[in-house]
Regions:
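C-terminal catalytic "cap/lid" subdomain
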Residues: 1-124
Length: 124
């Protein structure tokens, strides 16, 4: 876990920290949208997103479209405070113009960028 440090600009033009909670996944999606990024990368503790996580029928997700990922989310496959915020941020980014989201571990990121691993969420 961990989160961002919220700051506000004071009247003097300085920045001051404030007590608040920053959702780092949604903040990342917002920043990606603002800079007109085509791809959003979210690193996490697993190489690929799974449904039925930790159960005998666990299934890894390689390439998934928005509609399918939305359905999995609505079915409750992603725990709040864990994978759910990442999925919400991913869908938000794609719905607001992004082209692809990659979710993987930092170690697998180079291979994921080559399309060799990670979960790739696309529009269609």
């Amino acid at each position: 876990g961990g989160g961002g440090i919220p700051v506000v600009r004071t009247e003097a033009g300085d920045y001051q920290s404030v007590d608040a909670v920053i959702d780092k996944d949604l903040s990342t999606a917002l920043l990606a949208r603002e800079i007109h990024a085509d791809i959003l990368v979210i690193t996490t503790g697993v190489e690929k997103v799974c449904i039925h996580f930790g159960k005998p029928q666990q299934q890894v997700l390689d390439r998934v479209d928005i509609a399918t990922m939305t359905r999995y989310m609505q079915e409750g496959h992603f725990p709040p405070g864990s994978m759910l915020p990442k999925i919400i941020a991913s869908l938000t980014f794609l719905e607001q113009g992004g082209k692809e989201v990659i979710i993987t571990t930092p170690e697998c990121l180079p291979a994921a960028l080559r399309g060799e691993t990670g979960t790739h969420i696309i529009k269609t």
